[in-house]
């Protein structure tokens, strides 16, 4: 990979296939005894391949270009949701059932923290933003929301090798959330991207910005004593760790601390096995993504057999929607941990 990225080594079809079929879950990093940063190696290699137009087809570039155009994304998402209801949307897109109505956006209440709303998360799971706001209200924290220039973190662009586009989006995100207030993110993929801006941009300002970023659970968990009377859920909850929360941010334990305040936590026995969503991977490699998902579903079913739990929590929109496609028919619901926490508020 370094030879391709740095020295322009020849690229053949076999090499491209290897890179294209990597889900970029980064599960190899904690397993590697030498600590090789495979994630950054893959990103650098994909950047070199993208420059050669060997990967990242034109339709994918077009789709990614729509992400920062928030109104266009919202309109397109509504059209896709309607197409799903009419059975006109191909399942190979790898997109779970989208909401026809998403309700109002979060209204800022102050400036204690920033709540990063993102692009896909706001278009497809806006309820989770409103529930995050409810939790912050209960804790007694005010929040600001970035403007439209900070609506896309660039994570998918980075994964696709589109570094120039990712840098441009990162600069917009940083400009949209100035100051020193903490930045809370309720999407694991977005949080990992924002925390990596120091590496992406290589500036002191970007490193200071990245140091302000927290996954919402790691920030909320030590502050939940401010809400002492949470209502018990009444059933156990299976926790599924998004790869970018567990392997990249290493912030998966606070999810258990949050969920454990109102429900019994049920662990999976797969040591953080990827679910196969991988950002855009489920759309680009639907067969492989489906095979990976079936392995994950098998571990969830084992947890269900042990505990009777019919609720799975996952703190990333891609993971939750990808899993819900397979688990809905089995009577298992996939939710965001913050949604359950909001339901437990007194």
Which residue stretches match the model-derived regions?
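Iron-sulfur cluster-binding electron-transfer modules in prokaryotic oxidoreductases
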Residues: 38-346
